[in-house]
Amino acid sequence: MRESWGASLKTICLIGGKLQGFEAAYLSKKAGMKVLVIDKNPQALIRNYADEFQCFNITEEPEKLVAISKNVDAILPVNENLECIEFLNSIKEKFSCPVLFDFEAYRISRDKRKSKEYFASIGTPTPQDKPSEPPYFVKPPCESSSVGARIIHDRKELKELEPGMLIEEYVEGEVVSLEVIGDGNNFAVVKETLVHIDDTYDCHMVTPLPLDPSFRELSYSLAANLPLKGIMDVEAISGPLGLKVIEIDARFPSQTPTAVYYSSGINLIELLFRAFNGGIEEIKTLPEDRYCIYEHLMLAENGVLIPVGEQVLSMGNDYGNYYEEPGIEIFLCKGENPVFTLVFWGRDREEAEARKNKGLSILKSRFGAAA
């Protein structure tokens, strides 16, 4: 493995062609990079959005990936396949470019029980485990999926849970998110966002939030105590009793990075590369004259646009550009029902909302859609 990686990121190789991959590819393109996507699925969701798509299983043909590493500036895993992640960790020393990933942090964050132990070890406030009285909040023990997450109001229902499900107190409040990128010594806490969730606890919209010193301090502590060399997403509930961290995910997120980009001007792909090439600086101030609305809407059979989350989006078969003008970008995910990802930005919320209205009118004129 080379000791010096060079100063610029011109070509990035993404391992994974689903929603995480789309987010990373989008921001890479915004930074002027060429995007190569590798996925073992020939019908990978973003195969046509990438500049180049190669279909093969890296665990079966590692020599291909080693050869590719000589012609790209970085490799970024954008999937949650544990076999794939562990395999990349085992062969990363053979690559001629860095892997922009903290494997040890991912091991902790992927396992929600290990995460809770980590939170307790550094005094991070978090929902109580196995409370004596309902309501309870139950969620899967691994990965970042919201599948199976729900509120239980009757103790009897606990007996019907799938084995291994985590049981926590239900905490009222809004779901908030913060990305942190570290180089192992310095940790850049980026931009707070509000995660709008549906009845299945899946995110259908992201909007920016004002600076929150306590959330930034918590997120910094979580990154510094690992210590993080890579990217990590911190999610918390912000309620009447303050912040309670519900999970960390040490992998490149989907949805929030685009909202962060347009509301702060910070490209998380560029910042992540700097963590492996020369180091990063902590972020002290952010611009206040930016706002962004990021959301997913499905065109139902009755012509109505319905908010949906990533669970629906992930069932699509092709994802790419649909419409663009200053302050408006619309992406189309083809499938049983078309799902649009709409991104609107401006100097403030009012300008972003005006552009949202224009974007919705575009869909209405083309599809007869009603929001």
Swiss-Prot record:
Its cofactor is Mg(2+). ATP binds at K18, D39, N57, I58, E80, N81. Keywords: Amino-acid biosynthesis, ATP-binding, Ligase, Magnesium, Metal-binding, Nucleotide-binding. Mg(2+) 1 binds at E235, E247. One of its GO terms (molecular function) is ligase activity. It is an enzyme of class 6 (ligase). One of its GO terms (cellular component) is cytosol. It catalyses: (3R)-3-methyl-D-ornithine + L-lysine + ATP = (3R)-3-methyl-D-ornithyl-N(6)-L-lysine + ADP + phosphate + H(+). Binds 2 magnesium ions per subunit. Residues 93-277 form the ATP-grasp domain. GO terms for biological process: pyrrolysine biosynthetic process. Pathway: Amino-acid biosynthesis; L-pyrrolysine biosynthesis. Is required for the biosynthesis of pyrrolysine. Catalyzes the ATP-dependent ligation between (3R)-3-methyl-D-ornithine and L-lysine, leading to (3R)-3-methyl-D-ornithyl-N6-L-lysine. Is also involved in the synthesis of pyrroline-carboxy-lysine (Pcl), a demethylated form of pyrrolysine that is generated by the pyrrolysine biosynthetic enzymes when the growth media is supplemented with D-ornithine. This is 3-methyl-D-ornithine--L-lysine ligase. The gene is pylC.
